[in-house]
Amino acid sequence: LSPLLFQPSFGRRRVRAAAALPRRPGLVACSRGGTMQTFLKGKRVGYWLSEKKIRKLNFQAFAELCRKRGVEVVQLDLTKPIEDQGPLDVIIHKLTDVILEADQNDSQSLELVHRFQEYIDAHPETIILDPLPAIRTLLDRSKSYELIRRIEAYMQDERICSPPFMELTSACGEDTLKLIEKNGLAFPFICKTRVAHGTNSHEMAIIFNQEGLKAVRPPCVIQSFINHNAVLYKVFVVGESYTVVKRPSLKNFSAGISDRESIFFNSHNVSKPESSSVLTALDKIEGVFERPNDDVIREISKALRQALGVSLFGIDIIINNQTGQHAVIDINAFPGYEGVSEFFTDLLNHIAAVLQGQVPEVTQLNHSKLLAEQSGGIMDERICCASTGCLSVMGKDSSWIVESESNSSVKLQHQRLGCNSAVSPSFQQHCVATLATKASSQ
């Protein structure tokens, strides 16, 4: 298989970029070990990851890389006061399981989250990768899809479309189909759990007709299915750098109602690099076959970073085979970074950049107030309750899937953000305030 993800000229250019460190002011010398090692020496980085995540990432290799640069790495024990384990310049974490358990009123998890938040509140100088309110938004598909819809409306880029979606909060009744049609969805569509983390979050279904709705188990989110020639592009983001990995996805299906039985599948299994099944076997390429556009991916990644204040996340993107538009179908907090060979280097570079103040959190952008007003108005129009208790929140276009033949990856480097290129504080505050779930972490 070709090691290039994109067409030859584009791919070669990006492969060369993958071998180099991001060219940001102040970090060029760091790549040679001098300036960075001097600056990082004596810094302390704490981390909390599950044992499974530590093994999967081989995180001890990152700890060793840090130690070679003079950085002390501390594995945090949240059952003990974090204050006693400090001081800490940076904390890296994946508390998704703990947060979800805390939301279920698990006393031990509630205590862990409280202790973590208590330390954050007492030490605003400590950099958190990533903020808990943002993680809570990404754990909720309905909220993250609404965020994507708002970002799409803000960007006004015809190359981007956000799939129509609905949240179902109770069993579907007689009015559900009318509500689905009213909100712009059409068969077939994908049904997913609202919670975007854990084993169950990968269990999905393709619904082809009204009969298939009977098997839907709320609470869940339904999202329009967009044919994309069985290719999924996973974008793994680390600060201002990202890597695009091509994966298998679901094959094309005819638009409109059909007598097909619903298809139940595990998206994790379908989109594995080595996946091969009838669900991913493409009969033929239909319509257009567009490759991801670097500028589009860069702008989507930047908008998400600035709206949520996140650094470690993944974006699942498909290309509509009728329009060539990029559709974001899922966002994941701190993914597995499979296929990202330079993850640890990118992470350390990002930590250095943040500590040096080279990654601006937010700056001024003229139209942020207009976006807040526009998105607020649309939000009001898009929430309605049916007599059956179904709650719908519609997205503005159509799309979703997972698939591909190659596990090749290509590294794409971001340029350093300029002072006037970020989303304004009011936009960031608006997104987080309206989309993040209530939690003790806020």
PLM feature segments, named:
Residues S2-K56, Q60, Q85-L88, L95-I99, ...:
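Active-site nucleotide/adenylate-binding loops and adjacent lid/helix of ATP-dependent enzymes
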Residues C66-G86:
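A short, well-structured beta->alpha microelement
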Residues R67, I120-A122, Q306:
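Anion (oxyanion) recognition and catalysis
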Residues R69-V71, M155-C161, A307-S311:
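Short secondary-structure junctions
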Residues H93, C191, Q223, I315, ...:
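Active-site flanking residues adjacent to catalytic metal/cofactor-binding acidic residues
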Residues F253-R260, Y337-D346:
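A short, polar/charged loop-to-alpha-helix boundary motif
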